[in-house]
């Protein structure tokens, strides 16, 4: 048997990346395909239908474009014979979901529904189902639902049930016309194989499914809304299978489009951050993996089910079979830095960066690195896109304390970096206080590769060593590992994800170690962060929510005047 390869495809927020990997984890070729429609958050494509605040949609055709462009490109770049590619795996942002008809066609592609916002793909960061999430949590708490503590006491507006309920409330016809609500990752697998299978990772973390208990009861769904009583056996029906399972094989049509052979094994879908865990070679407890990009997802393995405040979920076999997989997260990290560079930086900074031939981020990072902890006089709460863990509240907003007339852009930049590190520390503390150990940190994604200052701050704030993934495409490599498992040993792949990760997972030799004097100062700053966190985040002062409410009321009044 000659040398064999697998392909992993990582569907992110703005683009899809395909990576061709050999069975030792060496990346042979990769290609990024930007989504032609990007994130749809203002106006629906091909129409003037305006979207409300907090909406975030996508176009499902963009996902197929990734298969049609990125996969043939990596084959061409590498010169690898398609016959030597034994499997394909994908991972996806989640919960990114869409309604489809009985043939599996997205409703937004049907002319009669094109101008209806609820027919489109709802991206993970669609936050317009907050009212539904609030009511769901209230009803679940009143009923004493057993599932609630597994999700840190709150179900997020980003997840499947809240999004489905929003569709039912705001466009019941779209709900009625929907045969299935699918995670986008499961829909792409359906397009490749012709088989509808739901992966246990997304079902467990985003759809309130439990390996032992299944979905919540019909009585619970009836308590939410009588029309939802039969949701799980109708519009959420379909087999739920473990990660690494073979979903099927490439159809003739998709094989031709992708430049691969019909019959190539396809692994069930996965969630982007979770695929990164084996991608860095982590297959045992005590090692927290941070998938760092626009947001951060924190993942950890444990040997028993513990309840942790504000965690996104604990799912048996949710990340690595045989362990309980814990997930927590921050709703915005890279997005905050990008917002500041785009919206908050004065013209002289942009001009200076251009003159030096560096990006604005690099210019700011270089100058911010000259400051000691505490020297900026600033402290921020990292809630620009709400708070995922531990407060689970998308109505919270950002805050910076300590501005003066002498405050510089690089000081603000550093304060924002530090704020996101404090947010991660808050999550680590929650795990440790509830008996889930965190001994060391692993970081992957775009940010750790680009920003050394950020990683040193994280090491200092958490007082833990951080190892960095060798790959820039860790989730895609993780997806490729699951492809090797789906292909099976008999075809040159692996028997289990543990075996695949031990052979294919890689980290850099360079690590970030805490600097003792920085740790001491950051401990003091963290205590102040905690006071602000609890004051604004736990109900003592709801000014952020009032401001957001007044903003939305004023905006709605202005729009109604424009329409009249």
Curated annotation (Swiss-Prot):
Signal peptide per UniProt: none
Q: Name one GO biological process term.
A: L-arabinose catabolic process to xylulose 5-phosphate
Q: What is the name of the protein in this document? A: Ribulokinase
PANTHER family listed in its UniProt record = FGGY CARBOHYDRATE KINASE DOMAIN-CONTAINING PROTEIN (PTHR43435:SF4), RIBULOKINASE (PTHR43435)
Q: Which reaction does it catalyse?
A: D-ribulose + ATP = D-ribulose 5-phosphate + ADP + H(+); L-ribulose + ATP = L-ribulose 5-phosphate + ADP + H(+)
What gene does this protein come from?
araB
UniProt EC number = 2.7.1.16
Q: Which family does it belong to?
A: Belongs to the ribulokinase family.
* Pathway annotation: Carbohydrate degradation; L-arabinose degradation via L-ribulose; D-xylulose 5-phosphate from L-arabinose (bacterial route): step 2/3
**KW Transferase (keyword) present:** yes
Q: What class of enzyme is it?
A: transferase
Tell me which GO cellular component terms the UniProt record holds: cytoplasm
What InterPro entries does the annotation carry? Answer: ATPase_NBD (IPR043129), Carb_kinase_FGGY (IPR000577), FGGY_C (IPR018485), FGGY_N (IPR018484), Ribulokinase (IPR005929)
Task: Tell me which Pfam families the record gives.
Answer: FGGY_C (PF02782), FGGY_N (PF00370)
Q: For this protein, what is any one GO molecular function term?
A: D-ribulokinase activity
Please name the source species: Geobacillus kaustophilus (strain HTA426)
Q: Which UniProt keywords apply?
A: Arabinose catabolism, ATP-binding, Carbohydrate metabolism, Kinase, Nucleotide-binding, Transferase
Q: Which HAMAP family has this protein been placed in?
A: Ribulokinase
């Amino acid at each position: 048997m000659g040398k064999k390869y697998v392909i992993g495809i990582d569907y992110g927020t703005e683009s899809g990346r395909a990576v061709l990997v050999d069975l030792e984890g060496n990346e042979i070729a990769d290609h990024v395909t930007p989504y032609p429609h990007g994130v749809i958050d203002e106006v629906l494509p091909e129409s003037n239908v305006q979207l409300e605040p907090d909406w975030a949609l996508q176009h499902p055709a963009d996902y197929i474009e990734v298969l049609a462009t990125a996969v043939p490109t990596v084959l061409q770049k590498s010169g690898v014979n398609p016959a030597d590619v034994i499997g394909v795996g994908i991972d996806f942002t989640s919960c990114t979901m869409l309604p489809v008809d009985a043939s599996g066609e997205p409703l937004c592609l049907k002319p009669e529904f094109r101008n209806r916002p609820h027919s489109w793909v709802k991206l993970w960061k669609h936050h317009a189902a907050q009212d539904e999430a609030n009511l769901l949590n209230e009803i679940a708490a009143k009923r004493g639902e057993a599932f609630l503590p597994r999700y840190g006491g709150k179900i997020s507006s980003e997840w499947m049930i809240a999004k489905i309920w929003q569709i039912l409330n705001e466009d019941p016809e779209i709900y009625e016309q929907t045969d299935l609500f699918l995670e986008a990752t499961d829909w792409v697998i359906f397009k490749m194989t012709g088989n509808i299978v739901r992966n246990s990772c997304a079902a467990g973390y985003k759809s309130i499914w439990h390996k032992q208990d299944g979905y919540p009861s019909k009585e619970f769904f009836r308590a939410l809304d009588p029309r939802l009583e039969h949701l799980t056996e109708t519009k959420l029906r379909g087999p739920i299978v473990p990660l690494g399972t073979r979903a099927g094989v490439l159809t003739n049509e998709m094989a031709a489009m992708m430049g691969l052979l019909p019959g190539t094994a396809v692994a069930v879908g996965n969630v982007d951050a979770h695929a990164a865990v084996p991608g860095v070679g982590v297959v045992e407890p005590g090692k927290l993996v941070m998938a760092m990009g626009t947001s951060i997802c924190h993942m950890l393995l444990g040997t028993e089910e513990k309840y942790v405040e504000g965690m996104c979920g604990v799912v048996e076999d949710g990340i690595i079979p045989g362990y309980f997989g814990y997930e927590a997260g921050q709703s915005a990290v890279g997005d905050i830095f990008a917002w500041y560079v785009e919206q908050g930086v004065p013209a002289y900074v942009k001009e200076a960066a251009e003159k030096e031939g560096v990006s604005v981020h690099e210019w700011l990072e270089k100058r911010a690195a000259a400051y000691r902890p505490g020297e900026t006089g600033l402290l921020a709460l990292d809630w620009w896109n709400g708070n995922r863990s531990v407060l689970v509240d998308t109505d919270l907003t950002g805050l910076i304390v300590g501005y003066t007339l002498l405050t510089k852009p690089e000081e603000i930049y550093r304060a924002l970096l530090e704020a996101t590190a404090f947010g991660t520390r808050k999550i680590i503390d929650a795990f440790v206080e509830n008996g889930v150990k965190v001994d060391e940190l692993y970081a992957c994604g775009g940010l750790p590769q680009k920003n050394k200052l950020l990683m040193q701050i994280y090491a200092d704030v958490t007082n833990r060593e951080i190892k960095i993934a060798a790959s820039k495409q860790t989730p895609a490599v993780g997806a490729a590992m699951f492809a090797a498992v789906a292909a099976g040993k008999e075809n040159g792949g692996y028997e289990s994800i543990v075996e695949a990760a031990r052979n294919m997972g890689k980290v850099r030799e360079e690590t970030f170690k805490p600097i003792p004097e920085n740790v001491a100062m950051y401990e003091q700053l963290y205590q102040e962060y905690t006071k602000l966190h609890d004051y604004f985040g736990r109900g003592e002062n709801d000014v952020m929510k009032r401001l957001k409410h007044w903003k939305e009321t004023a905006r709605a009044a202005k729009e109604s005047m424009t329409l009249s």
